[in-house]
Amino acid sequence: MAKVIGIDLGTTNSCVAVMDGKDAKVIENAEGARTTPSIVAFTDSDERLVGQPAKRQAVTNPENTFFAIKRLIGRRFEDPMVEKDKKLVPYKIVKADNGDAWVESHGTKYSPSQISAMILQKMKETAESYLGEKVEKAVITVPAYFNDAQRQATKDAGKIAGLEVLRIINEPTAAALAYGLDKKEGKTIAVYDLGGGTFDISILEIGDGVFEVKSTNGDTFLGGEDFDMRLVNYLADEFKKEQGIDLKNDKLALQRLKEAAEKAKIELSSSSQTEINLPFITADQTGPKHLAIKLTRAKFESLVEDLVTRTIEPCRAALKDAGLSAGEIDEVVLVGGMTRMPKVQETVKNFFGKEPHKGVNPDEVVAMGAAIQAGVLQGDVKDVLLLDVTPLSLGIETLGGVFTRLIDRNTTIPTKKSQVFSTAEDNQNAVTIRVFQGEREMAADNKLLGQFDLVGIPPAPRGMPQIEVTFDIDANGIVNVSAKDKGTGKEQQIRIQASGGLSDAEIEKMVKDAEANAEADKKRRETVEVKNQAEALIHSTEKSLKDYGDKVSEDDRKAIENAIAELKTATEGEDADAIRAKTTALAEASMKLGQAVYEASQAENAAGGTEETGGAKDDVVDADFEEIDEDDKKSA
């Protein structure tokens, strides 16, 4: 039975894990790392790079290198968060035909789901190369505070990558699974998850294989990227004060600043001071300029203090919804790379009144939890019951633009809820059901998930027709809504497709594109491998020709030299079949040379063997004595 993998699709880094016996194992990628940068780049030659290779070239290609794409997934172009993001990233964010926020490279538009799919494809390949078999099913994690549109877009990304997404699981819940799988006694835990782009807090009761989420809260636009940008702005401002040049207008310099900021942030978690050195960051008429700034941990903490403080309000709200006080939490589990920052740990300790638990790897624990959930779904992990919740209230718009809740936030999922509504006017023959998600009292202030019409209602005075609206949330947190006229039995239902979102036809096209890209990548990799083999053969043949060329006839020598020249010409192109054919031709042409080399080495061995045999008699006695006279030898 094919394995189901667990993928943590992160804002900054992604990670893949699989169940290995009773334990979840994180799989190393082709570069030997346990996490992969969530970065996709397109080069000028139209090559697609994913992960570390994409990150390495970001400085020289900032406009076509997409990072933190998770912040755009499932968002409309007009979303205030997208407006904010446009000011922070060097790449182009554009409005798609459906009103969603997409990105553009070399004139081609890509949806965030497509870019995410490229990262998922890389994780899929990583798992396939480790397992030695095809992988078609996965459990993918999302921030607990993701709304329906963001969850649906993540599921679409999986589909585009050629994966059947068996379950979308919340990141803090996945972390709790990995942390608490072997815990028998009952505990109430808080999972504080501050990652690269999002923040989540979940309160769970765990024990004896049952993981029950009591409440969840968070901020889908708060994470390490924001900490980096604070530092980038500070460095740019300091440089402007000193040199009078504004680096914020130079995309290349900004990308170098971003990389330096990320590195400095990581260093300051373990040391109290670091130095940022960026030679030749820019130049003016007086010559090149260099940036050199010393940064203390205290200074960095003062720059980001409000960002750390922003995590506390969601913690308060989550505790309130769970009906608990901070003192009733038995353990606080830290998840996400940003929780390595001492200031974050100190803030968590002060709020919850206890030292946070640091026994899990904050970068890997979410992927491990996803793998455990995959094991549960596959039947490999027994006696585990996971009860998650919906993070936001769901309802419809009613008369006067009021938001009428049908399902409150923190309701255990899967769940189903119905309520009867009626018409607002006499003889109304159709109603539009507008579905919203959020906590505000007016519908317009919440997130519109989608809308549909129920038509063919028989004419009647207002308030008479009975229209039953049913909300159904599945275990992925994805919503289905139906409306039924109880009088006629007419029913209309929709799987909520975000008011933008990708249509089935678009997803299908993207799946085909992804497959074609995977095929192109495979061909490119194949060509590189064939070239490597060809170059190795050229090198070894040239060396043999130099050493043993005089052992073959002039005609054979010429044939070998011609075959080498033809193969060299073939390796300058990209035709793998042509390179293979010329490699075979050279291998055949150089067989005579190989024979000559073999015969020469045989002759050498034979000569060496005769000498050894000849000298054996004299040497026999020498093994036992240190000194032997010629006279003694004769008398012996």
UniProtKB/Swiss-Prot annotation:
Which residues, by range, are in coiled-coil regions?
Answer: none
Q: Which domain of life is it from?
A: Bacteria
InterPro entries registered for this protein in UniProt: ATPase_NBD (IPR043129), Chaperone_DnaK (IPR012725), Heat_shock_70_CS (IPR018181), HSP70_C_sf (IPR029048), HSP70_peptide-bd_sf (IPR029047), Hsp_70_fam (IPR013126)
Return the Pfam families for the record. Answer: HSP70 (PF00012)
Compositionally biased residues, Acidic residues = 621-630
Q: Where is this region: Disordered?
A: 603-636
One annotated GO molecular function is: unfolded protein binding
Gene3D superfamilies xref list: 1.20.1270.10, 3.30.420.40, Actin, Chain A, domain 4, Substrate Binding Domain Of DNAk, Chain A, domain 1
Which UniProt key words apply to this protein? ATP-binding, Chaperone, Nucleotide-binding, Phosphoprotein, Stress response
Induction remarks: By stress conditions e.g. heat shock.
Entry-annotated residues carrying Phosphothreonine: T198
The UniProt record lists the keyword Kinase:
no
Q: Which family does it belong to?
A: Belongs to the heat shock protein 70 family.
Q: What does this protein do?
A: Acts as a chaperone.
Protein name as it appears in the record: Chaperone protein DnaK
Question: Which source organism does the UniProt entry give?
Answer: Chelativorans sp. (strain BNC1)
* Gene (name only): dnaK
